[in-house]
Amino acid sequence: MAFPEYSPAASAATFADLQIHPRVLRAIGDVGYESPTAIQAATIPALMAGSDVVGLAQTGTGKTAAFAIPMLSKIDITSKVPQALVLVPTRELALQVAEAFGRYGAYLSQLNVLPIYGGSSYAVQLAGLRRGAQVVVGTPGRMIDHLERATLDLSRVDFLVLDEADEMLTMGFADDVERILSETPEYKQVALFSATMPPAIRKLSAKYLHDPFEVTCKAKTAVAENISQSYIQVARKMDALTRVLEVEPFEAMIVFVRTKQATEEIAEKLRARGFSAAAISGDVPQAQRERTITALRDGDIDILVATDVAARGLDVERISHVLNYDIPHDTESYVHRIGRTGRAGRSGAALIFVSPRELHLLKAIEKATRQTLTEAQLPTVEDVNTQRVAKFADSITNALGGPGIELFRRLVEEYEREHDVPMADIAAALAVQCRGGEAFLMAPDPPLSRRNRDQRRDRPQRPKRRPDLTTYRVAVGKRHKIGPGAIVGAIANEGGLHRSDFGQIRIGPDFSLVELPAKLPRATLKKLAQTRISGVLIDLRPYRPPDAARRHNGGKPRRKHVG
């Protein structure tokens, strides 16, 4: 079908022009939003006017605010039944969207927003539903579970959003989405957002949306070319941060974290390690925030530990580095963060600490910014110790030309004559005294095992089976038109797993094999056994190869096969 195009030609210059709820307007001002993005300027008026909307938008365009702001402006917060339903493909996105609703609705005192996703306690979700939630954000699989348990009532839903619809269909949730839509009232306002518009999405839109406006908005590469971007895979973040600060030359740095509590905790640890650091968050009074920013600008402090909200609008030219201690869950925050460096035409550097389980977030940032992040290596112990020795030598050189040297030279010479101790020993003792008993050099990392040292470069590396994984059987295969993405999506959402928890996946004609953590909790196994993909019960269970079964029964082994 052909969609009418919504033109943003007369789009508002500010959020105040969009006639949104005054309390919502106040909240987005607190968040730091000043003017709407292209998709917000086009979508918010259409949704406020009651139209259905199809948004062709990638991550990083501001689409969450584009649908959350008008929904919050129109719901009845005195009614505790679900009025707004948002369907998303992953638990991470469910949490992200729910948090956004909470921020934009901060001044709607009776507002309750409930995220529903696999891997989370049913008891917590049931309590939230009994308490009453006007906004429910969730993944299709867990939504279906609640519908079948009759614990989720969608009969009074006025607003429905399908976010990242193409991802949901790719992950095999098409039937679940249709089932959920069938439980909602016929007359409701629907918004569908998708990065692409394949035939399946067009068909879904034609079936459930009425004369929708189509808004097309591509994410801009809002990252300046003068900012270098890289990431480091780390296990112990505080140790990694210390190494980077000791080795990387920087003028001033912002360290971004997710929580207010983390700002002060990390700043305190940095001060204890000899760095000039301060913290700002949304809880810091404005006067104190201004004093801290002035100290950063004047060079009285060099490291600022901050949350996203606290750093909005920060413009200090001497910030040469931005370090994402906690990787942001949305690309808008990432682009804003690294925009704090590279000001006034200066070059800047942005670094992300990432764990293996967070690599999918890294890929989302690359996709949205259309820039490849380079992997950097964590400074080694040798790198750190080389810098410490060099700085120690510099401190001696600086002290030799400083005031008061004559007095201490006389005292040291007297000590040398009276105790007959070499001058070098006296200097070493004074250096130890200055350290306060603290080790000067960083202890070496434990040596790599022989197995890790043996790279076997004389032949191609084959994928090695991870010892922490075991093979499970799922009762869906090629004849069910199921791909690896659908299996990963369903199991990750319902089992509370991350993509890094998966090993090899082999699709057979009638069933498939998937490698998962060997020590899955019994409750998780039970839940996954009842999970459905495209309506088919996957009946997940540990896999026992036919040859192993025959050997166990005294028979001859047979060739291993799948499906």
UniProtKB/Swiss-Prot annotation:
Ligand binding (ATP): A57, Q58, T59, G60, T61, G62, K63, T64
SMART domains, A to Z: DEXDc (SM00487), HELICc (SM00490)
UniProt entry tagged with the keyword Transcription regulation: no
Motif (DEAD box): 163-166
Keywords: ATP-binding, Cytoplasm, Helicase, Hydrolase, Nucleotide-binding, RNA-binding, Stress response
Main location: cytoplasm
Catalytic activity, as annotated: ATP + H2O = ADP + phosphate + H(+)
Disulfide bonds: none
Region listing for Disordered, in residue ranges: 441-470, 543-563
Database matches in Pfam families: DbpA (PF03880), DEAD (PF00270), DeaD_dimer (PF25399), Helicase_C (PF00271)
GO terms (BP aspect): cellular response to cold; response to cold; ribosomal large subunit assembly; RNA catabolic process
Basic residues bias (residue ranges): 551-563
SUPFAM superfamilies: P-loop containing nucleoside triphosphate hydrolases
Record domain Helicase ATP-binding: where: 44-215
Domain Helicase C-terminal: 226-385
GO molecular function: ATP binding; ATP hydrolysis activity; RNA helicase activity; RNA strand annealing activity
GO cellular component: cytosol; peptidoglycan-based cell wall
EC top class, as a word: hydrolase
Locus of motif Q motif: 13-41
Compartment annotation: Cytoplasm
Reported function: DEAD-box RNA helicase involved in various cellular processes at low temperature, including ribosome biogenesis, mRNA degradation and translation initiation.
Record family assignment: Belongs to the DEAD box helicase family. DeaD/CsdA subfamily.
Protein name, as recorded: ATP-dependent RNA helicase DeaD
Organism: Mycobacterium tuberculosis (strain ATCC 25618 / H37Rv)
Gene: deaD
